[in-house]
């Protein structure tokens, strides 16, 4: 099935790309969610409009991402208070939502929880940590925080 993407789809493409996908993937996921439209000659005109809008959005996003990166790197005192055992192990682990809330509480910028990249070994003990926040393609900021016992 030949489709035109209307939004960025991970491992497939960005808005405006013409892609060939299996029929079930197109009919059951991409089309119902509005992530793609069926490729027709008339739809190619829509591609031009989507690409123009995307270029303008990328310029705005790039400037905004640079501002957010500077704010995150200047941010200090981000702490996350969680319940722990006597040995310092957490009951559960620190999640991206917790990091976003802590950054916001410390006076930092609003982040999307999907931008935070947690390490393979999840945060399960108290201490100081550093994670990456992927703001846009090519702009990655480091977020430093400390996990303390509540």
Curated annotation (Swiss-Prot):
The family this protein is said to belong to: Belongs to the bacterial ribosomal protein bL9 family.
GO cellular component: ribonucleoprotein complex; ribosome
Domain of life: Bacteria
Gene name tied to this protein: rplI
Protein name as annotated: Large ribosomal subunit protein bL9
Gene3D superfamilies: Ribosomal protein L9, C-terminal domain (3.10.430.100), Ribosomal protein L9, N-terminal domain (3.40.5.10)
Key words of the record: Ribonucleoprotein, Ribosomal protein, RNA-binding, rRNA-binding
Organism expressing this protein natively: Corynebacterium glutamicum (strain R)
Pfam families from the UniProt entry: Ribosomal_L9_C (PF03948), Ribosomal_L9_N (PF01281)
Mitochondrion recorded as keyword: no
GO biological process, one term: translation
Job description of the protein: Binds to the 23S rRNA.
Stored SUPFAM superfamilies: L9 N-domain-like (SSF55658), Ribosomal protein L9 C-domain (SSF55653)
PROSITE patterns from the UniProt entry: RIBOSOMAL_L9
GO molecular function annotations of the record: rRNA binding; structural constituent of ribosome
Record-linked InterPro entries: Ribosomal_bL9, Ribosomal_bL9/RNase_H1_N, Ribosomal_bL9_bac/chp, Ribosomal_bL9_C, Ribosomal_bL9_C_sf, Ribosomal_bL9_N, Ribosomal_bL9_N_sf
């Amino acid at each position: 099935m030949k489709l035109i993407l209307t939004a960025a789809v991970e491992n497939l493409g960005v808005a405006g790309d013409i892609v060939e996908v299996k029929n079930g993937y197109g009919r059951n996921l991409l089309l119902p969610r509005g992530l793609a439209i069926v490729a027709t000659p008339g739809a190619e005109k829509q591609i031009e409009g989507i690409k123009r809008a995307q270029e303008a959005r990328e310029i705005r996003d790039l400037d905004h991402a640079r501002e957010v990166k500077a704010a995150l790197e200047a941010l200090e005192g981000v702490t996350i208070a969680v319940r722990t055992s006597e040995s310092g192990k957490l009951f559960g682990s620190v999640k991206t939502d917790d990091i976003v809330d802590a950054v916001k509480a410390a006076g930092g910028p609003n982040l999307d929880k999907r931008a935070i990249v947690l390490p393979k070994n999840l945060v399960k003990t108290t201490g100081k940590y550093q994670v990456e926040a992927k703001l846009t393609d090519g702009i990655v900021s480091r977020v430093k925080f400390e996990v303390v016992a509540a």
